[in-house]
Regions:
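Short hydrophobic beta-strand segments
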Residues: 1-8, 33-37, 107-111, 148-162, ...
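Donor-binding and catalytic core of enzymes assembling or modifying cell-surface/extracellular glycoconjugates
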Residues: 13, 183-256
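Conserved alpha-helical elements of sugar-nucleotide-dependent glycosyltransferases
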Residues: 15-18, 22, 171-174, 255
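N-terminal pre-catalytic "stem/leader" segment of glycosyltransferase-like enzymes
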Residues: 1-46
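Short, solvent-exposed loop/turn segments at secondary-structure junctions
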Residues: 10-11, 39-44, 114-115, 156-160, ...
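Secretory-pathway luminal glycosyltransferase catalytic domains
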Residues: 43-185
Length: 256
């Protein structure tokens, strides 16, 4: 059995998708059983992979490391001190062939694993796991079906604010240049982790832009890039809507 014990703590929702898929890909490559933390696991980054997806192939929920706690899950260094369980982190941000080929049963995966090379060989199974539950998918389809032409425009702020040196926030000039690739009459759905900020920007006053400011938020606070703590937006509906649109204007992010 292998797992990803810090799933939901080591990065936000987009990171969790890659981490889950990489865990599954490594397990399939070696013929291992695999597990992920249960739905009610308390984390520091809004654990949510159970909520929107069917996860058809999930069989085991739990942890590879014993005696875990939210404090132990907070960092890779902390989790290494729990016990003798091997905790294995990728060597860099590129595909780690050595990790992929030599991952031992009974180990715990860590890192961001942001490349499809970890799970390309089981792509269809990953797509099946990430099918949206009907209570999320159907309202989104009904909304999108109202429009003959609709694309989404992604505004990523959140924990990037205050860390622009290495997580740049794109300018309105970028969005202007990107919009030139689409018809003038296309509707533009604004998908963002900061709808309140977007609502204050005159850029989005045009009727072509569709912006929902009544977005559900997580109950607990999450640390932002500027050092403040906020209730961050639940991203499931936006992700589902984006998957149904006919085109995209992306901002730099894991989901982008």
């Amino acid at each position: 059995m292998i797992g990803y014990d810090r799933l939901g703590t080591n990065g936000r929702f987009g990171n969790q998708l890659f981490q889950y898929a990489a865990l599954r890909g490594i397990a399939a490559h070696h013929g291992y059983e695999w597990c992920i933390p249960p739905d009610d696991h308390h984390t520091y980054a809004n654990y949510g992979i159970h909520h929107p997806f069917k996860l058809k192939h999930l069989k085991h929920e739990g942890f590879v490391n014993a005696n875990n706690s939210p404090q132990a899950m907070f960092s890779y260094e902390n989790i290494q001190q729990l016990n003798s369980t091997p905790n294995v982190r990728e060597s860099g941000h590129n595909f780690d062939q050595e990790l992929f080929d030599n991952f031992e049963d009974g180990s715990n995966l860590d890192g961001f694993c942001q490349t499809e090379k970890y799970f390309k060989h089981i792509e269809n199974e990953i797509r099946e796991d990430f099918e949206f539950k009907d209570d999320i998918l159907q309202p989104c389809k009904e909304f999108i079906d109202q429009y003959e032409k609709i694309i989404f425009l992604h505004v990523r702020r959140g924990d990037n604010v205050g860390r622009e040196d290495y997580h740049p926030i794109v300018s309105f000039d970028y969005y202007d240049r990107a919009r030139k690739y689409f018809d003038d009459d296309v509707n533009i759905l604004v998908c963002t982790d900061d709808p309140e900020w977007c609502a204050e920007q005159s850029y989005f006053d045009d009727d072509r832009f569709l912006l929902n400011t009544d977005v559900p938020k997580y109950d607990h606070l999450c640390l932002e890039g500027d050092g403040t703590h906020k209730h961050s937006c639940v991203p499931y509906t936006d992700l589902c809507l984006m998957s149904l649109c006919q085109g995209a204007i992306l901002a730099p992010s894991t989901l982008g």
